[in-house]
């Protein structure tokens, strides 16, 4: 099993913090987000040599950090094409194993993912009070039916930036069309395309989850996470 961590975002909404520090190296109670994800994957039996990190913004800082603290992790530079689908596509040539895990590097969560990685084809979901910031996942009989745009409001499940799937999924990336509004290529479009042939099971994350995209989320995550010694076990 291999893993891809998406760590190429500029962190625009976290400026001025991210002007000098890349978002994946922002710390939660002293632990960089990137370390959190690598340690979590290691605890699942995915070694550093099986982990690929996609970088762009302040890439030299991330590469230096990995060389110092997480030797063996491979790094891929995201090119001109932007967005999460594009990021994964730049890493796909390094995928040899049939099973893959894709992780959005600007999230943090309590679930140990041991049940998640046992699934053949699943996406992580998290229930929130207001889905309007994220876009809503429509669930039918435990499986993904639809991922709606950010026009929905109210309580519901959102995509938590976690995918467990097979290598075949990577073939969908070249089919993703550029979003007219943002100019980016979204992984959720590839998920919905693959879902037509291989339905994704919805895995509801246990415990707390944060998208570290705004200052208030960063502050709240730092308040609630204290990382006990057995956190990654």
Q: Where on the chain are the PLM-derived regions?
A:
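A short, conserved beta-strand element in the Rossmann-like catalytic core
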Residues: 107-110, 209
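A structural signal for short hydrophobic beta-strand segments in well-ordered beta-sheet cores
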Residues: 25, 137-139, 202
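Short alpha-helix within the catalytic core of nucleotide-sugar-dependent glycosyltransferases
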Residues: 38-39, 59, 89, 110-119, ...
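Conserved donor-nucleotide/metal-binding helix-loop-beta segment in metal-dependent transferases, i.e.
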Residues: 111-134
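Active-site metal-binding loops of divalent metal-dependent hydrolases
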Residues: 10, 106-107
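N-terminal nucleotide-binding beta1-loop-alpha1 segment
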Residues: 1-19, 199
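Conserved N-terminal catalytic core of the sugar/cofactor nucleotidyltransferase
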Residues: 2-5, 13, 27, 31-104, ...
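Catalytic-core segments of class I nucleotidyltransferases/pyrophosphorylases
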Residues: 143-211, 215-233
């Amino acid at each position: 099993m291999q893993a891809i961590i998406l760590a190429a975002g500029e962190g625009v909404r976290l400026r001025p913090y991210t002007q000098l520090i890349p978002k994946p190296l922002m710390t939660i109670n002293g632990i960089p987000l990137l370390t959190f994800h690598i340690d979590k994957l290691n605890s699942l039996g995915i070694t550093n040599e099986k982990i690929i990190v996609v970088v762009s913004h302040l890439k030299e800082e991330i590469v230096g950090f990995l060389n110092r603290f997480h030797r063996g992790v491979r790094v891929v530079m995201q090119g001109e094409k932007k967005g999460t689908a594009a990021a994964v596509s730049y890493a796909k040539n390094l995928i040899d194993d049939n099973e893959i895990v894709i992780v959005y590097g600007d999230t943090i969560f309590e679930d140990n993912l041991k049940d998640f990685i046992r699934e053949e084809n699943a996406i992580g979901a998290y229930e929130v009070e207001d889905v309007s910031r994220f876009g809503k996942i429509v669930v039918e009989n435990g499986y993904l039916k639809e991922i709606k745009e950010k026009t929905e409001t109210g309580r519901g499940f959102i995509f938590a930036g976690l995918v467990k799937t097979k290598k075949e999924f990577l073939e969908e990336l070249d089919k993703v069309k550029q979003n007219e509004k943002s100019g980016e290529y979204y992984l959720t479009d590839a998920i919905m395309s693959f879902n037509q042939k291989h339905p994704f099971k919805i895995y509801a994350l246990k415990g707390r989850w944060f998208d570290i995209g705004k200052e208030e989320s960063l502050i709240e995550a730092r308040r609630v996470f204290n990382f006990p010694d057995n956190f990654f076990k």
